[in-house]
C-alpha cells in the first residue's frame, strides 16, 4: 500500500489532522473489535496531540494505550515518554489504570525489561511465540538522523526479526523499543514530523534508493496503512 503523505501549513493544522486520524481509527477499531489499541511516541511533536486527546469524549474503558519506545529512566524522570503522556493526556481522563501499559524500566536490566514487556504484549494480544500482534494504530516520530522509535542508524536493533521488543541504544544509553516487524504488523502507522531540521532525513526516506541502515524509518512498511503528517517546514521539499 502506497503511503499517504500530507504536508500541512503549520504544526497546529498537523495536530488537528492527527487528532482526526487517531480518533477515527480508534473509534473504528472499537466498533469492529470491541477495543482499540494505540502505541505512543515520545518527543515534543506529539505532546499537543495528547493534550487534545485529553479533551475528547471517548470510551476510555475500551482503549488500551502502549508505548512504542521508552528511555530507560524512571517514570518520574523528565525524559520519560510515559511521564509526558500521562501529564498531557492519560492523567486527565477517566481511563482505567489497567488499560495503560507502560514499558517497564525498573529491573536495572533493559534486556530483562524488554522480555517482560514482550511477554505482556503476547499475553494481551493472545499471540504465540514467533507471532506478531497487530496494533490498531502506532504513532511514530522522526529524528533528524532518520531514526524512529528507538531504532537508530547502524545499531543491532535494526536487525532483530524474531522479537516484539528489543533494546535500542542512543549514545550509550539503552532504550526499549518496538522491533521493525512488530511496527510493520500494524493496521495503521502514523508519522508526525515537524520542523525544517527533518528535511534531509525525509528526502532520503522518500528517495527511490537509500540505505535503510542509515535512515531506519525506511524500514517502516506496514501491512496496513502508512500515513505521514508533515508540517510545511518539514515537508517543504516533498511538495509535488
From Swiss-Prot:
Catalytic function, reaction form: 6-phospho-D-glucono-1,5-lactone + H2O = 6-phospho-D-gluconate + H(+)
Q: Which CDD domains match?
A: 6PGL (cd01400)
Instruction: Spell out the molecular function terms from Gene Ontology.
Output: 6-phosphogluconolactonase activity
Q: Name one GO biological process term.
A: carbohydrate metabolic process
Keywords tagged on the record: Hydrolase
Question: Entry's Gene3D superfamilies?
Answer: 3.40.50.1360
* SUPFAM superfamilies xrefs: NagB/RpiA/CoA transferase-like
Which pathway does it operate in? Carbohydrate degradation; pentose phosphate pathway; D-ribulose 5-phosphate from D-glucose 6-phosphate (oxidative stage): step 2/3
Signal keyword on record:
no
Q: Pfam families given for it?
A: Glucosamine_iso (PF01182)
Please report which protein family the annotation says this sequence is part of. Belongs to the glucosamine/galactosamine-6-phosphate isomerase family. 6-phosphogluconolactonase subfamily.
Function of the protein: Hydrolysis of 6-phosphogluconolactone to 6-phosphogluconate.
Q: What is this protein called?
A: 6-phosphogluconolactonase
Q: Which gene encodes it?
A: pgl
Amino acid at each position: 500500500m502506497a503511503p499517504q503523505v500530507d504536508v500541512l501549513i503549520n504544526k497546529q493544522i498537523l495536530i488537528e489532522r492527527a487528532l482526526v486520524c487517531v480518533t477515527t481509527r480508534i473509534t473504528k477499531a472499537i466498533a469492529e473489535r470491541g477495543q482499540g489499541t494505540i502505541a505512543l511516541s515520545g518527543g515534543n511533536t506529539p505532546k499537543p496531540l495528547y493534550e487534545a486527546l485529553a479533551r475528547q469524549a471517548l470510551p476510555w474503558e475500551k482503549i488500551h494505550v502502549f508505548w512504542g519506545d521508552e528511555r530507560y529512566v524512571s517514570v518520574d524522570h523528565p525524559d520519560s515518554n510515559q511521564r509526558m503522556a500521562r501529564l498531557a493526556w492519560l492523567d486527565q481522563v477517566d481511563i482505567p489504570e489497567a488499560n495503560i501499559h507502560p514499558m517497564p524500566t525498573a529491573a536495572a536490566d533493559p534486556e530483562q525489561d524488554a522480555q517482560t514487556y514482550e511477554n505482556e504484549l503476547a499475553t494481551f494480544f493472545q499471540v504465540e511465540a514467533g507471532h506478531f500482534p497487530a496494533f490498531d494504530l502506532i504513532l511514530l516520530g522522526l529524528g533528524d538522523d532518520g531514526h524512529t522509535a528507538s531504532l537508530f542508524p547502524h545499531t543491532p536493533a535494526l536487525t532483530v526479526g524474531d522479537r516484539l521488543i528489543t533494546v535500542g541504544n542512543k549514545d550509550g544509553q539503552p532504550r526499549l523499543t518496538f522491533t521493525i516487524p512488530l511496527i510493520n504488523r500494524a493496521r495503521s502507522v502514523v508519522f508526525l514530523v515537524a520542523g525544517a531540521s527533518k528535511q534531509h532525513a525525509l528526502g532520503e526516506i522518500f528517495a527511490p534508493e537509500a540505505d535503510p541502515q542509515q535512515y531506519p524509518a525506511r524500514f517502516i512498511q506496514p501491512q496496513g496503512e502508512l500515513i505521514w503528517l508533515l508540517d510545511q517546514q518539514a515537508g517543504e521539499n516533498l511538495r509535488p
